[in-house]
């Protein structure tokens, strides 16, 4: 194998084995000896702790005041229902918080498919069981709050901060935002030409279905790369502040009057007076414009309205006008 002894091998993605929609194996090789465990452990920790996702954070169940109670006609107690709701896999588009509702009556299981939601929400596993109703006259109604977050946030950390505004009957749930349910990696031997001391990294992962396993690994690698950027050049710990030069004139003043989309009559009158830029126009007064041949009060009103819509007006004073970029034209 050619190359300097100080050069590192760059791994390539060898294979992605999609066991199911939520289960995949990803293989990368070749890696320098020891890098299999270095990268595998780093990616594993990020995948478990830093993947954003959605989770149930609060629940209100009709007739239930606290989590240590039971509900007539429901097989499970309230704690078990809350535990089942923690396993709800939800994908939310464009929102950080949504409220879902569930209303069910009659004997039978209550599943995620019974939840009512809008088009921004997708229930990934509609067959997920929440509880069982055991009586024909039994019913259950609940409001479920789902939030977007990262990592694991126990309900105990939110109890005191929300105590004053949390009404009786609103039950807090431990929020497990991570869409990754299981992650493991294995390092095997790899060979390139005459070198037999290399690593092969095999990552096996299962998700709750709200994220594709391949996309999850891609995001984790991006997070790791971004966190390591600061170590690339330690001399640049403090970035110099770049002072933005404030332009001498508002860019809109440097645009031609044609950009105002005036009527043909008004535009021709302005060009006849050598008014080519918006900066030229705003310095004129109403009296000056009314002296322009063929420009009447109707055209003047049009010009004033168009300028006002852009935060400008007639009679403005512009120091050092025109700028050199225009004066040289």
Swiss-Prot record:
<dbReference type="InterPro" id="IPR011260">
    <property type="entry name" value="RNAP_asu_C"/>
</dbReference>
<keyword id="KW-0240">DNA-directed RNA polymerase</keyword>
<dbReference type="InterPro" id="IPR036603">
    <property type="entry name" value="RBP11-like"/>
</dbReference>
<comment type="function">
    <text>DNA-dependent RNA polymerase catalyzes the transcription of DNA into RNA using the four ribonucleoside triphosphates as substrates.</text>
</comment>
<dbReference type="Pfam" id="PF01193">
    <property type="entry name" value="RNA_pol_L"/>
</dbReference>
<protein>
    <recommendedName>
        <fullName>DNA-directed RNA polymerase subunit alpha</fullName>
        <ecNumber>2.7.7.6</ecNumber>
    </recommendedName>
</protein>
<dbReference type="GO" id="GO:0003677">
    <property type="term" value="F:DNA binding"/>
</dbReference>
<dbReference type="GO" id="GO:0005737">
    <property type="term" value="C:cytoplasm"/>
</dbReference>
<feature type="region of interest" description="Alpha N-terminal domain (alpha-NTD)">
    <location>
        <begin position="1"/>
        <end position="235"/>
    </location>
</feature>
<feature type="region of interest" description="Alpha C-terminal domain (alpha-CTD)">
    <location>
        <begin position="249"/>
        <end position="329"/>
    </location>
</feature>
<keyword id="KW-0548">Nucleotidyltransferase</keyword>
<keyword id="KW-0804">Transcription</keyword>
<dbReference type="InterPro" id="IPR011773">
    <property type="entry name" value="DNA-dir_RpoA"/>
</dbReference>
<dbReference type="GO" id="GO:0006351">
    <property type="term" value="P:DNA-templated transcription"/>
</dbReference>
<comment type="similarity">
    <text>Belongs to the RNA polymerase alpha chain family.</text>
</comment>
<dbReference type="Pfam" id="PF01000">
    <property type="entry name" value="RNA_pol_A_bac"/>
</dbReference>
<dbReference type="InterPro" id="IPR011263">
    <property type="entry name" value="DNA-dir_RNA_pol_RpoA/D/Rpb3"/>
</dbReference>
<dbReference type="GO" id="GO:0003899">
    <property type="term" value="F:DNA-directed RNA polymerase activity"/>
</dbReference>
<dbReference type="GO" id="GO:0046983">
    <property type="term" value="F:protein dimerization activity"/>
</dbReference>
<dbReference type="InterPro" id="IPR011262">
    <property type="entry name" value="DNA-dir_RNA_pol_insert"/>
</dbReference>
<dbReference type="Pfam" id="PF03118">
    <property type="entry name" value="RNA_pol_A_CTD"/>
</dbReference>
<comment type="subunit">
    <text>Homodimer. The RNAP catalytic core consists of 2 alpha, 1 beta, 1 beta' and 1 omega subunit. When a sigma factor is associated with the core the holoenzyme is formed, which can initiate transcription.</text>
</comment>
<keyword id="KW-0808">Transferase</keyword>
<dbReference type="GO" id="GO:0000428">
    <property type="term" value="C:DNA-directed RNA polymerase complex"/>
</dbReference>
<dbReference type="InterPro" id="IPR036643">
    <property type="entry name" value="RNApol_insert_sf"/>
</dbReference>
